[in-house]
Amino acid sequence: DTTNDHLKKTPKRSYNYFKEYTKKTDLDFIQFCSKNNIKSTQSNSSSQVNISISLDNISVHSICKHHLLPFYGNVYISYISKGFVLGLSKFKRIIDFLSKEFTTQEDLTYRIATYILKILPVKTLYVTLKCVHSCMIVRGIKDLNSTTTTKICLHERDEGIINEIMKDI
């Protein structure tokens, strides 16, 4: 209804919403890392080799390409170091960079893991996303309580380490 004052600007608002939510830079990932000083550094301590490092509850949000509705939640990253580290805030920057497009949670999980591997040499990398999908809330089954969890483990798979990581999530 183009005569309704509340709806007149809705098409423009929708356009601006999608434009803002998917505002991805023209930089490719390597350029993005260079511009934002995202690089791994070798630890001076030999104790950093084989140490397990975990980051929990890193917020993430994106738009699902199936229904064009947001999904949001947390990312959990754990890795076994090969003597290299990455500044903790850099993980959030990588997640934000990769989530600024229409995607699926499964694809985003895979991309976060593979892109971290491009700049951080590790023995094992484990990435988990736990997200709420708006499509589950506002359409179909209208479930307010469900979350979707996606997980990926790259490189050496150590069940003991995975079990240790999982009890913290």
Language-model region placement:
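A domain-level signal for the structural core that forms small-molecule/cofactor-binding pockets
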Residues: 1-169
